[in-house]
Design a protein with these regions (language model features):
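Alpha-helical transmembrane segments of multi-pass membrane transport proteins
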Residues: 1-184
């Protein structure tokens, strides 16, 4: 079945991206975008899981890539390791909702042919709401525990980080545009 072939290829793409440094570029972009919030590294973890899940389609690949990079950074900044693990584990399932999602592909097959493109379009809002709600809860906990806030980045840092992460973000647009447009 051609639809089932997408699953191992999404996982392979996630592993290749992790080894190629895309996860690190996405984490740096998330740092620039959300680094000024209380518990900034926890917010970076959530945003990076959402971005990486949107590229790889796999929550497991997202958890491994982002968690392996973020856990040492959070420990160095004084975050409780249990809190860091909880944030990573609770935010990686957003990769199951934000397309392309392996779970939505399997659901399409099991349900008797529900349109994968329609499922992918329906996954964006719940995935984003899940990420935003996790960020609210994380912000409250981080403020109570007194976790650090990163300094405000300069415009040059924002530009440089965005330019470096742009190919990663264009990959999401290419994959989703191809699937929704019927090219893939």
């Amino acid at each position: 079945n051609f639809a089932l072939l997408a699953i191992p290829f999404f996982i392979l793409a996630g592993n290749i991206m992790n080894q190629g440094g895309i996860a690190e570029r996405l984490i740096n972009l998330a740092k620039v975008l959300g680094g000024r919030l209380p518990g900034s590294l926890a917010h970076v973890n959530i945003m990076a899981n959402m971005l990486f899940g949107a590229i790889s389609g796999s929550a497991v690949a997202s958890a491994a890539a982002v968690g392996g990079t973020m856990a040492p950074m959070q420990k160095k900044e004084g975050y409780d390791p249990a809190f860091s693990a909880a944030v990573n584990i609770s935010s990686c399932p957003s990769g199951l909702l934000i397309p392309p999602s392996n779970t939505l592909i399997v659901f399409s097959l099991v349900s008797g042919g529900t349109s994968i493109a329609a499922l992918f379009l329906a996954g964006y809002i719940p995935g984003l709401l899940m990420g935003l709600s996790l960020m609210v809860v994380t912000g409250i906990i981080a403020k109570r525990r007194g976790y650090p806030v990163s300094p405000k980045p300069s415009c040059a840092q924002i530009w440089d980080t965005t330019v470096k992460a742009l190919p990663s973000l264009l990959l999401v647009i290419l994959i989703m545009g191809g699937i929704i447009g019927g090219i893939f």
